[in-house]
Protein backbone atom coordinates (compact mmCIF):
# COMPACT_ATOMS: atom_id res chain seq x y z
CA UNK A 1 0.00 0.00 0.00
CA UNK A 2 2.85 2.36 0.89
CA UNK A 3 4.57 1.79 -2.45
CA UNK A 4 1.30 2.21 -4.32
CA UNK A 5 0.74 5.52 -2.51
CA UNK A 6 4.23 6.71 -3.40
CA UNK A 7 3.69 5.74 -7.04
CA UNK A 8 0.46 7.74 -7.11
CA UNK A 9 2.15 10.78 -5.57
CA UNK A 10 5.00 10.45 -8.06
CA UNK A 11 2.56 10.23 -10.98
CA UNK A 12 0.67 13.27 -9.77
CA UNK A 13 3.91 15.20 -9.30
CA UNK A 14 5.00 14.28 -12.84
CA UNK A 15 1.63 15.35 -14.22
CA UNK A 16 1.78 18.63 -12.30
CA UNK A 17 5.31 19.28 -13.59
CA UNK A 18 4.16 18.62 -17.16
CA UNK A 19 1.20 20.97 -16.76
CA UNK A 20 3.41 23.70 -15.32
CA UNK A 21 5.92 23.23 -18.14
CA UNK A 22 3.21 23.40 -20.80
CA UNK A 23 1.67 26.47 -19.15
CA UNK A 24 5.05 28.21 -18.99
CA UNK A 25 5.81 27.26 -22.59
CA UNK A 26 2.47 28.67 -23.75
CA UNK A 27 2.96 31.84 -21.71
CA UNK A 28 6.49 32.39 -23.05
CA UNK A 29 5.51 31.64 -26.65
CA UNK A 30 2.53 33.96 -26.40
CA UNK A 31 4.71 36.73 -24.98
CA UNK A 32 7.27 36.25 -27.77
CA UNK A 33 4.38 36.34 -30.26
CA UNK A 34 3.25 39.71 -28.86
CA UNK A 35 6.81 41.07 -28.97
CA UNK A 36 7.27 39.81 -32.53
CA UNK A 37 4.48 42.13 -33.76
CA UNK A 38 5.38 44.99 -31.44
CA UNK A 39 8.79 45.03 -33.14
CA UNK A 40 7.17 45.83 -36.49
CA UNK A 41 6.26 49.39 -35.47
CA UNK A 42 7.68 52.16 -37.64
CA UNK A 43 10.70 53.50 -35.71
CA UNK A 44 10.54 56.81 -37.60
CA UNK A 45 7.10 57.52 -36.10
CA UNK A 46 6.84 58.42 -32.42
CA UNK A 47 3.22 57.33 -32.09
CA UNK A 48 2.46 53.91 -30.56
CA UNK A 49 0.87 50.96 -32.33
CA UNK A 50 -2.82 50.60 -31.38
CA UNK A 51 -3.63 48.63 -28.23
CA UNK A 52 -5.00 45.12 -28.45
CA UNK A 53 -4.05 41.45 -28.34
CA UNK A 54 -2.43 39.26 -30.99
CA UNK A 55 -3.86 36.10 -29.44
CA UNK A 56 -1.97 32.81 -29.70
CA UNK A 57 0.97 32.02 -32.00
CA UNK A 58 -0.03 31.44 -35.64
CA UNK A 59 -3.80 31.29 -35.08
CA UNK A 60 -4.01 34.66 -33.33
CA UNK A 61 -7.57 35.47 -32.22
CA UNK A 62 -9.29 33.67 -35.10
CA UNK A 63 -10.97 31.20 -32.73
CA UNK A 64 -12.31 33.98 -30.50
CA UNK A 65 -13.61 35.82 -33.59
CA UNK A 66 -15.45 32.76 -34.93
CA UNK A 67 -16.98 31.86 -31.55
CA UNK A 68 -17.89 35.32 -30.27
CA UNK A 69 -19.33 36.80 -33.47
CA UNK A 70 -20.40 40.43 -33.02
CA UNK A 71 -19.29 40.25 -29.38
CA UNK A 72 -15.65 40.00 -30.52
CA UNK A 73 -15.59 43.47 -32.06
CA UNK A 74 -17.77 45.17 -29.46
CA UNK A 75 -15.87 43.77 -26.46
CA UNK A 76 -12.50 44.82 -27.85
CA UNK A 77 -13.79 48.20 -28.95
CA UNK A 78 -15.02 48.82 -25.39
CA UNK A 79 -11.65 47.74 -23.98
CA UNK A 80 -9.24 49.31 -26.49
CA UNK A 81 -11.20 52.01 -28.34
CA UNK A 82 -12.19 52.56 -31.98
CA UNK A 83 -8.76 51.53 -33.31
CA UNK A 84 -7.22 48.29 -32.02
CA UNK A 85 -4.89 45.53 -33.18
CA UNK A 86 -5.61 41.82 -33.43
CA UNK A 87 -4.53 38.79 -35.49
CA UNK A 88 -7.13 37.07 -37.70
CA UNK A 89 -7.03 34.48 -40.48
CA UNK A 90 -3.26 34.22 -40.40
CA UNK A 91 -2.25 37.88 -40.45
CA UNK A 92 -1.89 40.95 -38.19
CA UNK A 93 -4.81 43.32 -38.45
CA UNK A 94 -5.86 46.74 -37.20
CA UNK A 95 -9.63 47.12 -36.93
CA UNK A 96 -11.08 50.58 -37.33
CA UNK A 97 -14.47 52.05 -36.36
CA UNK A 98 -15.93 55.55 -36.69
CA UNK A 99 -16.86 57.79 -39.61
CA UNK A 100 -13.74 59.98 -39.56
CA UNK A 101 -11.37 57.04 -39.21
CA UNK A 102 -13.14 55.11 -41.98
CA UNK A 103 -13.16 58.21 -44.21
CA UNK A 104 -9.36 58.46 -44.03
CA UNK A 105 -8.97 54.84 -45.10
CA UNK A 106 -11.51 54.93 -47.92
CA UNK A 107 -10.21 58.23 -49.29
CA UNK A 108 -6.62 57.01 -48.95
CA UNK A 109 -6.98 54.27 -51.59
CA UNK A 110 -3.89 53.96 -53.85
CA UNK A 111 -1.64 56.25 -51.74
CA UNK A 112 -2.14 55.34 -48.05
CA UNK A 113 -3.74 51.94 -48.47
CA UNK A 114 -4.51 49.38 -51.14
CA UNK A 115 -7.12 46.65 -51.15
CA UNK A 116 -6.03 43.25 -49.93
CA UNK A 117 -8.51 40.63 -48.80
CA UNK A 118 -7.39 37.70 -46.61
CA UNK A 119 -5.21 35.23 -48.52
CA UNK A 120 -7.91 32.55 -48.55
CA UNK A 121 -10.39 35.02 -50.09
CA UNK A 122 -7.90 36.20 -52.73
CA UNK A 123 -6.95 32.68 -53.76
CA UNK A 124 -10.51 31.33 -53.88
CA UNK A 125 -12.05 34.25 -55.78
CA UNK A 126 -9.16 34.28 -58.25
CA UNK A 127 -6.59 36.81 -59.51
CA UNK A 128 -8.72 38.25 -62.33
CA UNK A 129 -11.50 39.71 -60.16
CA UNK A 130 -12.33 43.38 -59.61
CA UNK A 131 -12.04 42.98 -55.84
CA UNK A 132 -8.47 41.64 -56.06
CA UNK A 133 -7.16 44.16 -58.61
CA UNK A 134 -5.39 47.44 -57.77
CA UNK A 135 -4.35 50.69 -59.43
CA UNK A 136 -4.96 51.15 -63.15
CA UNK A 137 -6.00 47.50 -63.54
CA UNK A 138 -8.75 48.07 -60.96
CA UNK A 139 -9.92 51.28 -62.63
CA UNK A 140 -10.08 49.60 -66.04
CA UNK A 141 -11.95 46.56 -64.69
CA UNK A 142 -14.51 48.80 -62.96
CA UNK A 143 -15.17 50.59 -66.25
CA UNK A 144 -15.81 47.25 -67.95
CA UNK A 145 -18.01 45.86 -65.15
CA UNK A 146 -19.92 49.11 -64.49
CA UNK A 147 -22.09 48.62 -67.59
CA UNK A 148 -23.54 45.48 -66.01
CA UNK A 149 -25.19 47.70 -63.39
CA UNK A 150 -26.21 50.66 -65.56
CA UNK A 151 -29.76 52.03 -65.44
CA UNK A 152 -30.52 50.45 -68.82
CA UNK A 153 -29.18 47.05 -67.72
CA UNK A 154 -31.13 47.09 -64.44
CA UNK A 155 -34.33 47.95 -66.31
CA UNK A 156 -33.82 44.90 -68.52
CA UNK A 157 -33.19 42.59 -65.53
CA UNK A 158 -36.20 43.84 -63.54
CA UNK A 159 -39.04 41.81 -65.19
CA UNK A 160 -36.99 38.60 -64.93
CA UNK A 161 -36.11 39.26 -61.29
CA UNK A 162 -39.77 39.90 -60.49
CA UNK A 163 -40.83 36.61 -62.10
CA UNK A 164 -38.15 34.61 -60.27
CA UNK A 165 -39.25 36.12 -56.94
CA UNK A 166 -42.95 35.52 -57.69
CA UNK A 167 -42.31 31.88 -58.57
CA UNK A 168 -40.26 31.42 -55.40
CA UNK A 169 -42.84 32.98 -53.06
CA UNK A 170 -45.57 30.87 -54.67
CA UNK A 171 -43.49 27.76 -53.99
CA UNK A 172 -42.88 28.84 -50.38
CA UNK A 173 -46.61 29.41 -49.82
CA UNK A 174 -47.58 26.04 -51.32
CA UNK A 175 -45.16 24.19 -49.05
CA UNK A 176 -47.13 22.44 -46.26
CA UNK A 177 -44.40 22.95 -43.68
CA UNK A 178 -42.31 25.90 -42.52
CA UNK A 179 -39.26 26.70 -44.62
CA UNK A 180 -35.69 27.63 -43.71
CA UNK A 181 -35.69 31.23 -44.95
CA UNK A 182 -31.92 31.74 -45.11
CA UNK A 183 -31.34 28.51 -47.02
CA UNK A 184 -34.20 29.28 -49.41
CA UNK A 185 -33.00 32.88 -49.84
CA UNK A 186 -29.60 31.51 -50.84
CA UNK A 187 -31.26 29.30 -53.46
CA UNK A 188 -33.31 32.28 -54.69
CA UNK A 189 -30.34 34.62 -55.10
CA UNK A 190 -28.24 31.85 -56.66
CA UNK A 191 -31.01 31.15 -59.17
CA UNK A 192 -31.30 34.86 -59.91
CA UNK A 193 -27.55 35.11 -60.52
CA UNK A 194 -27.42 32.04 -62.78
CA UNK A 195 -30.67 32.47 -64.72
CA UNK A 196 -31.11 36.27 -64.87
CA UNK A 197 -27.66 37.83 -64.49
CA UNK A 198 -25.64 35.29 -66.44
CA UNK A 199 -28.36 33.84 -68.67
CA UNK A 200 -27.20 30.24 -68.21
CA UNK A 201 -29.64 27.50 -69.24
CA UNK A 202 -28.46 24.91 -66.73
CA UNK A 203 -30.79 21.90 -66.14
CA UNK A 204 -32.54 21.95 -62.76
CA UNK A 205 -30.67 18.88 -61.44
CA UNK A 206 -27.29 20.34 -62.41
CA UNK A 207 -28.29 23.69 -60.91
CA UNK A 208 -29.04 21.98 -57.59
CA UNK A 209 -25.63 20.29 -57.58
CA UNK A 210 -23.90 23.55 -58.52
CA UNK A 211 -25.68 25.28 -55.63
CA UNK A 212 -24.40 22.72 -53.12
CA UNK A 213 -20.85 23.14 -54.42
CA UNK A 214 -21.18 26.91 -54.27
CA UNK A 215 -22.33 26.74 -50.66
CA UNK A 216 -19.15 24.82 -49.82
CA UNK A 217 -17.15 27.48 -51.66
CA UNK A 218 -18.75 30.42 -49.80
CA UNK A 219 -18.48 28.74 -46.39
CA UNK A 220 -14.69 28.59 -46.78
CA UNK A 221 -13.95 31.94 -48.44
CA UNK A 222 -12.91 33.29 -45.02
CA UNK A 223 -10.81 30.41 -43.68
CA UNK A 224 -7.31 29.91 -42.37
CA UNK A 225 -5.11 29.68 -45.50
CA UNK A 226 -3.72 26.26 -44.53
CA UNK A 227 -3.81 23.79 -47.42
CA UNK A 228 -4.14 20.50 -45.55
CA UNK A 229 -6.49 17.54 -46.12
CA UNK A 230 -9.94 18.19 -44.61
CA UNK A 231 -9.12 21.87 -43.92
CA UNK A 232 -11.69 24.52 -44.82
CA UNK A 233 -9.24 26.07 -47.26
CA UNK A 234 -8.75 22.74 -49.07
CA UNK A 235 -12.55 22.29 -49.31
CA UNK A 236 -12.80 25.79 -50.74
CA UNK A 237 -10.14 25.02 -53.38
CA UNK A 238 -11.91 21.81 -54.38
CA UNK A 239 -15.24 23.65 -54.64
CA UNK A 240 -13.63 26.36 -56.79
CA UNK A 241 -12.20 23.78 -59.19
CA UNK A 242 -15.60 22.09 -59.56
CA UNK A 243 -17.34 25.43 -60.08
CA UNK A 244 -14.82 26.54 -62.69
CA UNK A 245 -15.45 23.38 -64.72
CA UNK A 246 -19.21 23.88 -64.54
CA UNK A 247 -18.94 27.58 -65.40
CA UNK A 248 -16.66 26.93 -68.38
CA UNK A 249 -19.16 24.43 -69.78
CA UNK A 250 -22.05 26.87 -69.30
CA UNK A 251 -20.10 29.78 -70.83
CA UNK A 252 -19.11 27.77 -73.92
CA UNK A 253 -22.71 26.61 -74.45
CA UNK A 254 -23.97 30.17 -74.04
CA UNK A 255 -21.44 31.62 -76.49
CA UNK A 256 -22.49 29.06 -79.10
CA UNK A 257 -26.24 29.72 -78.68
CA UNK A 258 -27.24 33.36 -79.20
CA UNK A 259 -30.75 32.93 -80.61
CA UNK A 260 -34.10 33.45 -78.89
CA UNK A 261 -32.96 36.04 -76.31
CA UNK A 262 -35.21 38.97 -75.45
CA UNK A 263 -32.67 40.89 -73.35
CA UNK A 264 -28.91 41.26 -72.81
CA UNK A 265 -27.74 39.63 -69.59
CA UNK A 266 -24.73 40.60 -67.50
CA UNK A 267 -22.38 38.19 -69.26
CA UNK A 268 -23.39 39.57 -72.68
CA UNK A 269 -22.78 43.12 -71.43
CA UNK A 270 -19.46 42.13 -69.84
CA UNK A 271 -18.13 40.60 -73.06
CA UNK A 272 -19.33 43.55 -75.17
CA UNK A 273 -18.04 46.15 -72.70
CA UNK A 274 -14.64 44.46 -72.67
CA UNK A 275 -14.48 44.65 -76.47
CA UNK A 276 -15.44 48.35 -76.37
CA UNK A 277 -12.46 48.96 -74.11
CA UNK A 278 -10.16 47.20 -76.56
CA UNK A 279 -9.75 43.87 -74.79
CA UNK A 280 -11.01 40.37 -75.55
CA UNK A 281 -11.57 38.47 -72.30
CA UNK A 282 -9.89 35.07 -71.96
CA UNK A 283 -11.87 32.04 -70.77
CA UNK A 284 -10.11 32.22 -67.39
CA UNK A 285 -11.07 35.90 -67.02
CA UNK A 286 -14.67 35.05 -67.94
CA UNK A 287 -14.75 32.23 -65.36
CA UNK A 288 -13.31 34.44 -62.63
CA UNK A 289 -15.65 37.27 -63.61
CA UNK A 290 -18.76 35.09 -63.48
CA UNK A 291 -17.65 33.53 -60.19
CA UNK A 292 -17.25 37.02 -58.71
CA UNK A 293 -20.64 38.12 -60.05
CA UNK A 294 -22.34 35.10 -58.47
CA UNK A 295 -20.49 35.70 -55.20
CA UNK A 296 -21.53 39.37 -55.16
CA UNK A 297 -25.18 38.60 -55.99
CA UNK A 298 -25.49 35.49 -53.82
CA UNK A 299 -24.16 35.67 -50.28
CA UNK A 300 -24.77 39.30 -49.29
CA UNK A 301 -28.18 39.55 -51.01
CA UNK A 302 -29.37 36.32 -49.38
CA UNK A 303 -28.27 37.72 -46.02
CA UNK A 304 -30.11 41.01 -46.55
CA UNK A 305 -33.22 39.21 -47.87
CA UNK A 306 -33.38 37.08 -44.71
CA UNK A 307 -32.91 40.15 -42.51
CA UNK A 308 -35.72 41.92 -44.41
CA UNK A 309 -38.15 39.04 -43.80
CA UNK A 310 -37.13 38.79 -40.15
CA UNK A 311 -37.75 42.50 -39.54
CA UNK A 312 -41.13 42.44 -41.30
CA UNK A 313 -42.03 39.54 -39.00
CA UNK A 314 -40.90 41.44 -35.92
CA UNK A 315 -42.57 44.70 -36.96
CA UNK A 316 -46.03 44.10 -38.48
CA UNK A 317 -46.76 47.85 -38.34
CA UNK A 318 -43.89 48.42 -40.78
CA UNK A 319 -45.31 45.79 -43.14
CA UNK A 320 -48.79 47.34 -42.95
CA UNK A 321 -47.40 50.82 -43.65
CA UNK A 322 -45.56 49.39 -46.64
CA UNK A 323 -48.80 47.82 -47.90
CA UNK A 324 -50.54 51.19 -47.53
CA UNK A 325 -47.90 52.84 -49.73
CA UNK A 326 -48.24 50.10 -52.37
CA UNK A 327 -52.04 50.35 -52.23
CA UNK A 328 -51.89 54.12 -52.73
CA UNK A 329 -49.67 53.61 -55.80
CA UNK A 330 -51.87 50.84 -57.21
CA UNK A 331 -49.14 48.24 -56.77
CA UNK A 332 -50.70 45.94 -54.18
CA UNK A 333 -51.50 43.13 -56.61
CA UNK A 334 -52.83 39.60 -56.14
CA UNK A 335 -50.47 36.66 -56.08
CA UNK A 336 -52.82 34.56 -58.20
CA UNK A 337 -51.04 35.21 -61.50
CA UNK A 338 -47.60 36.30 -62.72
CA UNK A 339 -47.40 40.03 -63.28
CA UNK A 340 -44.26 40.47 -65.34
CA UNK A 341 -43.62 44.06 -66.26
CA UNK A 342 -45.79 45.68 -63.57
CA UNK A 343 -42.72 47.23 -61.94
CA UNK A 344 -40.29 49.70 -63.44
CA UNK A 345 -37.26 51.46 -61.97
CA UNK A 346 -39.04 54.83 -61.85
CA UNK A 347 -42.00 53.16 -60.10
CA UNK A 348 -39.75 51.69 -57.41
CA UNK A 349 -37.85 54.96 -56.95
CA UNK A 350 -41.18 56.67 -56.15
CA UNK A 351 -41.86 54.33 -53.21
CA UNK A 352 -40.25 56.43 -50.48
CA UNK A 353 -41.24 54.34 -47.46
CA UNK A 354 -40.02 51.18 -49.19
CA UNK A 355 -36.68 52.92 -49.70
CA UNK A 356 -36.56 53.76 -45.98
CA UNK A 357 -37.27 50.12 -45.04
CA UNK A 358 -34.44 48.81 -47.23
CA UNK A 359 -32.03 51.46 -45.92
CA UNK A 360 -32.85 50.54 -42.32
CA UNK A 361 -32.35 46.81 -42.98
CA UNK A 362 -28.94 47.59 -44.48
CA UNK A 363 -28.02 49.88 -41.57
CA UNK A 364 -28.91 47.51 -38.76
CA UNK A 365 -28.07 44.24 -40.53
CA UNK A 366 -25.22 45.02 -42.91
CA UNK A 367 -24.30 41.65 -44.50
CA UNK A 368 -20.52 42.14 -44.38
CA UNK A 369 -18.50 43.37 -41.41
CA UNK A 370 -16.23 45.65 -43.42
CA UNK A 371 -13.45 45.87 -45.97
CA UNK A 372 -9.76 44.96 -45.95
CA UNK A 373 -6.80 47.13 -46.93
CA UNK A 374 -3.02 46.81 -46.72
CA UNK A 375 -0.99 49.83 -45.58
CA UNK A 376 1.31 51.32 -48.25
CA UNK A 377 2.93 53.90 -45.96
CA UNK A 378 2.77 54.57 -42.23
CA UNK A 379 0.10 57.08 -41.25
CA UNK A 380 -1.64 58.40 -38.14
CA UNK A 381 -5.14 57.40 -37.09
CA UNK A 382 -6.86 58.40 -33.86
CA UNK A 383 -3.53 59.06 -32.11
CA UNK A 384 -1.85 55.81 -33.21
CA UNK A 385 0.56 54.86 -35.96
CA UNK A 386 -0.72 52.45 -38.60
CA UNK A 387 2.55 50.80 -39.73
CA UNK A 388 3.43 50.12 -43.35
CA UNK A 389 2.82 46.49 -44.29
CA UNK A 390 0.05 45.87 -41.76
CA UNK A 391 -3.52 45.09 -42.76
CA UNK A 392 -6.45 47.30 -41.85
CA UNK A 393 -10.12 46.37 -41.68
CA UNK A 394 -12.62 49.22 -41.56
CA UNK A 395 -15.78 48.15 -39.76
CA UNK A 396 -19.07 49.01 -41.47
CA UNK A 397 -21.39 47.45 -38.91
CA UNK A 398 -19.70 48.99 -35.87
CA UNK A 399 -19.51 52.38 -37.54
CA UNK A 400 -23.30 52.21 -38.00
CA UNK A 401 -23.73 51.11 -34.37
CA UNK A 402 -21.66 53.99 -32.99
CA UNK A 403 -22.69 56.76 -35.41
CA UNK A 404 -23.93 59.76 -33.36
CA UNK A 405 -26.30 60.83 -36.17
CA UNK A 406 -28.56 57.82 -35.54
CA UNK A 407 -30.96 57.94 -32.59
CA UNK A 408 -31.70 54.69 -30.74
CA UNK A 409 -29.25 52.78 -32.94
CA UNK A 410 -30.48 49.33 -31.87
CA UNK A 411 -34.12 50.05 -32.79
CA UNK A 412 -35.48 49.09 -36.22
CA UNK A 413 -37.00 52.40 -37.33
CA UNK A 414 -37.32 53.01 -41.11
CA UNK A 415 -38.74 56.50 -40.48
CA UNK A 416 -35.27 57.67 -39.45
CA UNK A 417 -34.55 57.89 -43.20
CA UNK A 418 -37.80 59.74 -44.02
CA UNK A 419 -37.86 63.37 -45.14
CA UNK A 420 -38.96 64.57 -41.70
CA UNK A 421 -35.80 63.24 -40.00
CA UNK A 422 -33.20 62.25 -42.63
CA UNK A 423 -30.74 61.09 -39.98
CA UNK A 424 -28.26 60.02 -42.66
CA UNK A 425 -27.91 63.49 -44.21
CA UNK A 426 -25.19 64.59 -41.75
CA UNK A 427 -21.88 62.93 -42.48
CA UNK A 428 -21.10 60.92 -45.57
CA UNK A 429 -19.32 58.08 -43.79
CA UNK A 430 -21.77 57.40 -40.95
CA UNK A 431 -23.83 55.19 -43.28
CA UNK A 432 -21.89 52.98 -45.68
CA UNK A 433 -23.49 49.53 -46.15
CA UNK A 434 -21.87 49.28 -49.59
CA UNK A 435 -18.48 50.69 -48.64
CA UNK A 436 -17.25 53.95 -50.11
CA UNK A 437 -14.58 55.75 -52.10
CA UNK A 438 -13.25 54.31 -55.35
CA UNK A 439 -14.22 50.80 -54.24
CA UNK A 440 -17.90 51.41 -53.54
CA UNK A 441 -19.78 48.18 -54.28
CA UNK A 442 -20.47 48.05 -58.02
CA UNK A 443 -23.61 45.97 -57.55
CA UNK A 444 -25.29 48.10 -54.87
CA UNK A 445 -28.10 49.27 -57.16
CA UNK A 446 -28.84 45.69 -58.23
CA UNK A 447 -28.90 44.57 -54.58
CA UNK A 448 -31.32 47.35 -53.61
CA UNK A 449 -33.46 46.60 -56.67
CA UNK A 450 -33.72 42.92 -55.69
CA UNK A 451 -34.63 43.75 -52.08
CA UNK A 452 -37.28 46.25 -53.15
CA UNK A 453 -38.92 43.78 -55.54
CA UNK A 454 -38.83 41.11 -52.82
CA UNK A 455 -40.48 43.50 -50.34
CA UNK A 456 -43.19 44.47 -52.85
CA UNK A 457 -43.99 40.82 -53.63
CA UNK A 458 -43.94 39.81 -49.95
CA UNK A 459 -46.36 42.61 -49.06
CA UNK A 460 -48.63 41.84 -52.03
CA UNK A 461 -48.75 38.06 -52.14
CA UNK A 462 -47.78 36.61 -48.74
CA UNK A 463 -48.63 36.28 -45.09
CA UNK A 464 -45.88 34.73 -43.00
CA UNK A 465 -45.51 33.55 -39.42
CA UNK A 466 -42.53 32.58 -37.28
CA UNK A 467 -42.58 28.79 -36.84
CA UNK A 468 -40.45 28.76 -33.67
CA UNK A 469 -41.08 30.20 -30.20
CA UNK A 470 -38.23 32.71 -30.44
CA UNK A 471 -36.16 34.35 -33.14
CA UNK A 472 -32.76 32.71 -33.75
CA UNK A 473 -29.51 34.35 -32.74
CA UNK A 474 -27.35 35.97 -35.43
CA UNK A 475 -23.85 34.98 -36.53
CA UNK A 476 -21.54 37.09 -38.71
CA UNK A 477 -19.37 34.60 -40.64
CA UNK A 478 -19.07 34.41 -43.60
CA UNK A 479 -21.94 36.94 -43.77
CA UNK A 480 -24.59 37.97 -41.26
CA UNK A 481 -27.32 35.32 -40.98
CA UNK A 482 -29.52 33.51 -38.42
CA UNK A 483 -27.80 30.50 -36.86
CA UNK A 484 -30.76 28.18 -37.48
CA UNK A 485 -31.78 29.80 -40.75
CA UNK A 486 -35.10 31.36 -39.57
CA UNK A 487 -38.02 28.92 -39.76
CA UNK A 488 -41.13 30.60 -41.22
CA UNK A 489 -44.53 29.37 -42.49
CA UNK A 490 -45.76 31.19 -45.61
CA UNK A 491 -49.33 31.55 -46.87
CA UNK A 492 -50.45 33.00 -50.19
CA UNK A 493 -52.90 35.93 -50.38
CA UNK A 494 -55.87 36.41 -52.68
CA UNK A 495 -56.85 39.73 -54.28
CA UNK A 496 -58.56 40.78 -51.01
CA UNK A 497 -55.38 40.13 -48.97
CA UNK A 498 -56.91 37.00 -47.41
CA UNK A 499 -54.90 33.83 -46.72
CA UNK A 500 -54.87 31.10 -49.34
CA UNK A 501 -54.51 27.63 -47.83
CA UNK A 502 -51.40 25.65 -48.97
CA UNK A 503 -53.46 23.05 -50.87
CA UNK A 504 -55.27 25.81 -52.80
CA UNK A 505 -51.95 27.55 -53.45
CA UNK A 506 -50.52 24.29 -54.82
CA UNK A 507 -53.44 24.00 -57.28
CA UNK A 508 -52.97 27.63 -58.35
CA UNK A 509 -49.25 27.05 -58.88
CA UNK A 510 -50.00 24.00 -61.02
CA UNK A 511 -52.22 26.07 -63.31
CA UNK A 512 -49.77 28.95 -63.81
From Swiss-Prot:
EC number: 1.14.13.-
GO cellular component: endoplasmic reticulum membrane
Predominant cellular place of this UniProt entry's protein: endoplasmic reticulum
Alphabetized UniProt keyword annotations: Endoplasmic reticulum, Heme, Iron, Lipid metabolism, Membrane, Metal-binding, Microsome, Monooxygenase, Oxidoreductase
Cross-referenced SUPFAM superfamilies: Cytochrome P450
Topology of this chain in the membrane: Peripheral membrane protein
Cofactor(s) needed: heme
The UniProt record lists the keyword Cell cycle: no
Pfam families: p450
Reaction(s) catalysed by this chain's protein: all-trans-retinoate + reduced [NADPH--hemoprotein reductase] + O2 = all-trans-4-hydroxyretinoate + oxidized [NADPH--hemoprotein reductase] + H2O + H(+); all-trans-retinoate + reduced [NADPH--hemoprotein reductase] + O2 = all-trans-18-hydroxyretinoate + oxidized [NADPH--hemoprotein reductase] + H2O + H(+)
Binding site for heme: 441
Subcellular location(s) of the protein: Endoplasmic reticulum membrane; Microsome membrane
Protein name: Cytochrome P450 26B1
Lineage: Eukaryota, Metazoa, Chordata, Craniata, Vertebrata
Gene expressing this chain: CYP26B1
